Curated annotation (Swiss-Prot):
Protein name per Swiss-Prot or TrEMBL: DNA repair protein RecO
Organism classification: Bacteria, Bacillati, Bacillota, Bacilli, Bacillales
InterPro entries assigned to the protein according to its UniProt record, in alphabetical order: ARFGAP/RecO, DNA_rep/recomb_RecO_N, NA-bd_OB-fold, RecO, RecO_C
Database matches in Gene3D superfamilies: Nucleic acid-binding proteins, Recombination protein O, C-terminal domain
Entry keywords, A to Z: DNA damage, DNA recombination, DNA repair
SUPFAM superfamilies in alphabetical order: ArfGap/RecO-like zinc finger (SSF57863), Nucleic acid-binding proteins (SSF50249)
Annotated GO CC locations: bacterial nucleoid
Family named by the database record: Belongs to the RecO family.
Pfam family, one: RecO_N
PANTHER family: DNA REPAIR PROTEIN RECO (PTHR33991:SF1)
HAMAP family referenced in this protein's UniProt entry, alphabetically: RecO (MF_00201)
Length: 263
């Protein structure tokens, strides 16, 4: 029996000469893998609807293993993401993370909305680094590894100058900073943004302008925290680091790509 769902394409890999195995993250059922027969053919009605990051309505026959994709109707192709190598790199990173931390057919409407809203913001041209930071912060609770952000992880105080301790999994106030010689120094702006990114309703996100120095502090905290606690090894993370290096040396921002998160 075919069932209708709202879904985002998070992975598409070639299977044989003409087919694809397409993994969706659906609003109704969570992650679902399907066989899209003939989708590699440019003339196929499944070709456009199985492009990475596409948001649409789909008719799917589910099974315990790989289901069958019957048809799809595009709501938003997210074409702007796929047409820019930097945007595609960031989008690929968040969909791979979503793929790695979720199990098949475990419904999570919150995560669906988080993924959809983030991709829409990326498609609209909002700050990619900030969107990635927000997504990383919010995924910490999904993975069950939330940091201590409301108070000092050692003494519980809520006021003072804070740094971040990977060892203590949260903020350290200036009175307790000597408990971790490897703590990461933070500006007041970084402390505020880490809290904001963790708690903010993403649908209410406005324009956020963040200094490069602050972004470096945020990246230092999140990269170290993920390395220590997440257990994730993401190919797209390594590619993202290479892309950021290209950006720093002035690589042309607009570049055509259709690779997205496929493969």
């Amino acid at each position: 029996m075919f069932e209708k769902c709202e879904a985002i394409v998070i992975r598409a890999i070639d299977y044989g000469e003409t087919n694809k195995i397409v993994t969706f993250f659906t609003r109704e059922w969570g992650k679902v893998a399907t066989m899209a027969r003939g989708a590699k053919k440019p003339s196929s009605r499944l070709s456009a609807v199985t492009q990475p990051f596409t948001h649409g309505y789909y008719l799917i026959q589910r099974s315990r293993g790989v289901g069958v994709l019957h048809q799809g109707d595009i709501i938003d192709s997210m074409r702007t993401i796929r047409e820019d190598i930097f945007t595609a790199a960031y989008a690929s990173y968040i969909v791979e993370m979503t793929d790695k931390v979720t199990e098949e057919q475990q419904r999570n409407p919150y995560l669906f909305e988080l993924l959809l809203q983030t991709l829409q913001y990326m498609n609209e041209g909002l700050d990619l680094e900030i969107l990635a930071c927000i997504y990383e912060m919010k995924m910490l609770s999904v993975m069950g590894i939330p940091p201590k952000l409301d108070h000092c992880a050692v003494c519980g105080r809520t006021e003072g100058k804070f740094s971040f301790s990977i060892k203590e999994a949260g903020f350290l106030c200036h009175r307790c900073e000597k408990t971790d010689p490897y703590r990461i120094p933070l500006s007041a702006a970084s402390v505020r943004l880490l809290r904001l990114f963790y708690y903010i309703d993403l649908s209410r996100l406005g324009t956020i302008s963040v200094k490069e120095e602050t972004k470096k502090e945020l990246r230092a905290v999140l990269s170290s925290y993920y390395d220590e606690y997440s257990g994730l090894s993401l190919k797209t993370k390594r590619f993202l680091m290479q892309i950021d290096e290209l950006k720093k040396i002035g690589y042309p921002y607009q570049n055509q790509t259709e690779n997205g998160s496929g493969g």
